[in-house]
């Protein structure tokens, strides 16, 4: 499942195809099956499984058919030479004669191969030799094998591009479209050697040819002198309820290829069978294979044909009769679950169950499986582990379950399979996805599923209105991950059934998934009429998981997420949560072929607009509020400090207590603030200057504007230091901050910016607390906050402990950085449960840039620019993007919440006024001064 990560952060050293073995192990499909009898398989513990796959149709007669083994045993008894090329293989000649007798028309010359893909290769070579033309025409989504020529004829780029396929001279037409075929033949027949097609496109989703299509196609080929190749590797020899899938009215193709059932499930063998007119002696002289034409495999092939033809093809008639019953039962299942099963297709014992895709509205987990081509593998895992039914996906359609049982199954086995599929469909219909995934972490399933029905968190977004496309497509992608354990349930309501232990195992399992699509938003509209579309790319892990994995192992994963975003057409990619942190505010991902943003600038801007709204509703004066910024040296905390300095009475910058240079780093931020404000101290003050600005003007203004000769002896060194200050790096900012502090001390005043590493130890109580750390822990407890404090918590997950909300009615806590779009769109469960239209600022910045068509990098690194903040603020205003109403713990705050805070704070003030002792000490009942 994590193919690209082997060697990056997953060490999976199985010597037998580690990629596939990792996938099978991860999907709980690696259980050793040690015994097979008929249509039953058994594991090492003796548990029985019903085989409804028969190795993609190769085990048509069931496992270990006694007659087939007897044919092999007879070879040993007779001491028949197994391989004697270039001499005459007697059994191979006998098998060729028998095939000539049973195949349609005058198909009578056989070249044996070791597999179906090699049979297709032989057919391609023969057609080119016979016609002298290079081009092989095949169908879109056809499947003919994985050797290079057969792969080139396979009309699916997924399997081709890595291997330099398709090779030159391959072309494709839509399957079932005779008019398209005729048009190509009319135009290019003189270059086309052959047209290859399947009676049923098995790997495309078990798609039967439209009535009359095969006959028309073969007739068109005859008319234009192009050879026809019918690929019956999967459909031939009884699979469809007839000896061949080729309709009788179609006539005889020039070449027919067989494999799978011909080997009886014991030996690999393929056959390229041609008419005399299509045969070419040059091909016969030059084409050979060391291991083909062996007597051993030919004896098995002869026995397989005997079983098929016995009693007037009794086993084939059995497949026809019971295949009709299988399709009937599947269609009954579709009728019972019309929201689950999209279609049922097939013939005989080759059936496809086509499931509706999952869009993410009701489950990010199911959308992750669905959008990233793992849905049917996941269903097959559930059926195997819970119901002991062996199935598999088709190769070219990630939503079709293949049902391809051995010919030996009857009505009882079909009913058992339908019961298992019914349980799957019922669970899907009830959205009880917990009961589908709980086996994946390796838990033995013991609890019986209930019958609870779960609802999607949001109704689907309305279909987008038609728009007139102007200019390039505006598209974005955004990387998301879980922020708290409760997010697992928010995204998948049925996960409430997980026990704590189960959820822990699920978390551990899912975190090793590669980045994958979880939601597609078809349209988001600006107030200007601009339109963009986008997608969410999920990294299903918690912040602690990302932190443990570290930058070295996370960056390749994020690089793959960017590649996925580009494949979806994204022009800007936003980094949510800890994906921004681990990439140094997107700095490590710049220059990777697509624009990136950490989203930190708009998050900060909207957090400050939220503060303005909350303080207005509480009738508080922001310029009178001393403000603490917790996480002041981080990207958001630093930018917020720079911008808040224009609005509040004073600042306390709180650094990381675990960092030895925390106070130095805080002083550097203070130096940046002072440098920004000092330029204003030399000019006429604005009509409304901030308190910090006024203080700097009062203390530094004289030092900056008064000639040195008119200053006191004590002032001269400070004035010279300020004039000579050259701020070009962190050391310069730190020196500037120290100079400002000295100047304020000389004036007998405290500097307007203080520092601490703990909110409790700050010199001044904070009326407003802005929290924006990179920690995934709760850092702000109830006893750290002054009475009546307002707390803006930007951190994800929140840094303010839930007990603050539950125990401190006098304190108002709200989630900072939330944004409201002009229209109420959502991204499925919206992860954090907000109502449609409301989202995190980092996501909103990504959407905003897409709407604007701005595909430059933004919000990069730790030093965010106030000028960029102003640019995005103006952009947001133009497009109708604004700060969301304040929320706390995912719930929108109402007027009663504000009134409750006012009442509680007023009661505390009365209590403090009455309590003389506390008044004397200046301490409140909370342990912080009022």
Place the predicted regions along the sequence by residue.
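Conserved N-terminal phosphate-binding loop of PLP-dependent enzymes in the Aspartate aminotransferase
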Residues: 1-458
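Short acidic-hydrophobic, aromatic-tinged amphipathic segments that line or gate anion-handling sites
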Residues: 171-175, 597-598, 683, 750-758, ...
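Short glycine-/small-residue-rich Rossmann-like dinucleotide-binding loops
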Residues: 200, 773-775, 795-796
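Short, conserved loop/helix-junction motifs that constitute active-site signature segments
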Residues: 250, 782-787, 805-808
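Adenosine-phosphate binding glycine-rich loop
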Residues: 472-473, 492-499, 503-509, 513-535, ...
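Glycine/serine-rich phosphate-binding loop and adjoining beta1-alpha1 elements at the start
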Residues: 521-623, 828-833, 840
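Glycine-rich phosphate/diphosphate-binding loop of Rossmann-like nucleotide-binding domains
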Residues: 616-765
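Rossmann-fold NAD(P) dinucleotide-binding segment
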Residues: 708, 726, 774-789
